[in-house]
């Protein structure tokens, strides 16, 4: 762009230069017949009266001669012109100005920003700075991904809902009280202590046949161990057909209270083939036979007949395959957690909600449920934005995906990432290194990085990440010199000066990054090296455990509506009418409580 501008400027100046050439030609035309001596002799006189131009017979000839000379000079200039980029011969990379970039992107007040480093924020109103709010955070264990990025941004309690993947429950424990005081409704999917969790039933969010298909596909994908490859995909395909038949039946025919995975397991057990030589139908076969009579075109029947076309031995193997996939739902804790729904996913785009997904950091057995949650969240939020709210959610939703690599995501996550901005949805992808992202999305990882306008590097010890950051920083042009010395009778000493290029930071320098610094990339800006955010300087730190506030506890009784002691009641004060009606009466808990409250009021 700079070179194009220089060329345009040169052309414009060349055209403008024609005017003084014509003026000079007309000025010297009367003296041209005497040759150069006469022109030189009259030159001082001519310039004493520069606008005293006299036309003569030689005027046209003089103008043409000087224009020809001028044109030849311009031609020689452009033909020999060099394309120099001084101080940029080997690269133009340099560090960005922290204050200038912060001034460009920061909004007021502080809560209207995403905190990137100690001195740089980026405003939440993406229409002002025209950058999306997707952020890729990369840092090794102990680099401060949670403390220096995730927690400060949650503490900001910005004008959006949060979906937070929280290994160990640390973020919830530290910031739960703050979020409630800032008007957030806190909901928790707790896969560590399921008895404390809000219930989550994926069946509630099945709106059409496509949703059922996506649920089953996602369930099989997320329950497949990483790196495993089946030599014979027939069994998984057949098992998925059986599961589709069961889910479609429950979705279309069962009452709401029976639409859950616990009932899927009951149906699977009802269809168990005990004796391969016994041709008698199972209770599940009878159930679908009745459906055949009522609705022979039912979609559940199509999948059930596809599954049921094999021999008894094959069907039994298919059932075992599906039972192995769903074996976690035999646990009472998980069956209870998925029996009803309290998460109300669509409301996240309508009011301030903080949804925490707590997962064990040392056991991934139940992480498949978070994978299903992510998929259905994207479906619900995108549907609400497109069909209810005119294209954009009234309450923006931000996904804080800490330990991103621990949960399976949809294969088309890169496409989801590219279209979520317009709907008011954004994500923070938090990784230990880029190798994790490459392992999850071997072919799409670059697309995912490209759809994040902010990349925050906190430090680490993984070589490919060092190389990537170094290449992202680019090369700068530097001065170098070499020294030469020869000894002897005619010895001499020489110094040669030259320019060279080097990376702004080499890979080993990236590895040696001081633990108090972070490197921030914003699309279209110079890279920034700045201090990591000091959580103790956050204005809301007093409401968190870092500021000595009490830890947040979920799933426990925190409010006592009424406390009544039986011995405080005098039987003589009870209404006489009720005592006369009968000698005794068996009352429910609610009736006893109402009676005691009425007695205390009187």
Where are these regions (language model features)?
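Basic- and hydrophobic-enriched, low-structure N-terminal and domain-boundary segments
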Residues: 1-143, 147-152, 195, 486, ...
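Short, surface-exposed polybasic-aromatic patches that bind anionic ligands, especially phosphate groups
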Residues: 534
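Conserved ATP-driven motor cores of ASCE-family P-loop NTPases powering translocation/secretion/packaging/pilus
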Residues: 417-419, 423-519
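Extended hydrophobic/Leu-rich segments
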Residues: 39-46, 52, 56, 486-490, ...
């Amino acid at each position: 762009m700079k070179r194009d501008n220089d060329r345009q400027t040169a052309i414009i100046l060349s055209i403008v230069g024609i005017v003084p050439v014509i003026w000079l030609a007309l000025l010297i035309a009367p003296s041209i017949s005497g040759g150069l001596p006469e022109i030189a002799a009259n030159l001082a006189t001519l310039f004493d009266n520069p606008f005293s131009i006299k036309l003569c017979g030689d005027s046209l000839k003089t103008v043409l001669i000087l224009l020809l000379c001028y044109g030849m000079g311009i031609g020689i200039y452009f033909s020999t012109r060099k394309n120099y980029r001084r101080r940029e011969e080997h690269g133009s990379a340099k560090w960005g100005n922290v204050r200038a970039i912060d001034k460009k992107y920061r909004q007021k007040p502080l809560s209207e920003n995403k905190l990137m480093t100690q001195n740089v924020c980026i405003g939440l109103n993406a229409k002002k700075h025209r950058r999306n709010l997707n952020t890729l955070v990369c840092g090794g264990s102990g680099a401060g991904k949670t403390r220096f990025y995730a927690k400060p941004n949650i503490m900001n309690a910005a004008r959006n809902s949060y979906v937070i993947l929280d290994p160990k429950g640390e973020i919830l424990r530290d910031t739960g009280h703050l979020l409630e005081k800032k008007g957030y409704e806190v909901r928790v999917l707790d896969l560590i202590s399921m008895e404390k969790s809000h219930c989550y039933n994926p069946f509630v969010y099945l709106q059409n046949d496509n949703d059922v298909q996506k649920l089953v596909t996602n369930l099989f994908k997320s329950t497949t161990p990483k790196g495993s490859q089946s030599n014979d995909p027939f069994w998984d395909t057949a098992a998925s057909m059986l599961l589709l038949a069961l889910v479609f039946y429950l979705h279309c025919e069962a009452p709401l209270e029976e639409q859950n995975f616990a009932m899927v397991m009951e149906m699977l057990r009802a269809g168990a083939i005990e004796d391969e030589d016994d041709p008698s139908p199972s209770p599940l076969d009878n159930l679908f036979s009745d459906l055949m009579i009522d609705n022979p075109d039912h979609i559940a029947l199509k999948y059930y007949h596809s599954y049921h076309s094999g021999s008894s031995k094959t069907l039994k193997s298919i059932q075992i395959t599906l039972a192995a996939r769903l074996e976690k739902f035999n646990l009472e804790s998980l069956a209870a957690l998925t029996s009803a729904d309290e998460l109300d996913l669509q409301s996240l785009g309508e009011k301030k909600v903080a949804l925490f997904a707590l997962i064990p950091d040392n056991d991934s057995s139940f992480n498949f449920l978070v994978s299903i949650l992510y998929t259905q969240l994207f479906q619900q939020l995108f549907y609400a934005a497109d069909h209810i709210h005119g294209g954009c959610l009234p309450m923006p939703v931000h996904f804080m995906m800490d330990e991103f690599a621990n949960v399976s995501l949809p294969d088309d996550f890169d496409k989801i990432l590219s279209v979520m901005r317009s709907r008011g949805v954004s994500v923070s992808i938090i990784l230990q290194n880029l190798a994790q992202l490459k392992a999850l999305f071997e072919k799409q990882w670059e697309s995912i990085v490209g759809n994040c306008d902010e990349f925050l590097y906190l430090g680490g010890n993984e070589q490919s990440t060092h190389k990537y950051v170094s290449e992202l920083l680019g090369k700068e042009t530097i001065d170098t010199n070499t020294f030469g010395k020869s000894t002897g009778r005619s010895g001499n000493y020489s110094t040669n000066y030259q320019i060279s290029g080097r990376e702004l930071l080499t890979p080993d320098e990236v590895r040696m990054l001081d633990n108090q610094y972070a490197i921030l990339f914003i699309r279209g800006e110079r890279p920034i090296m700045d201090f990591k955010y000091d959580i103790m300087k956050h204005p809301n730190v007093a409401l968190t455990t870092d500021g000595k506030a009490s830890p947040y506890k979920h799933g426990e009784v925190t409010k006592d509506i009424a406390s009544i002691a039986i011995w405080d009641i005098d039987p003589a004060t009870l209404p006489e009418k009720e005592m006369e009606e009968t000698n005794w009466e068996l009352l429910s808990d609610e009736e006893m409580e109402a009676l005691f409250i009425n007695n205390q009021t009187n």
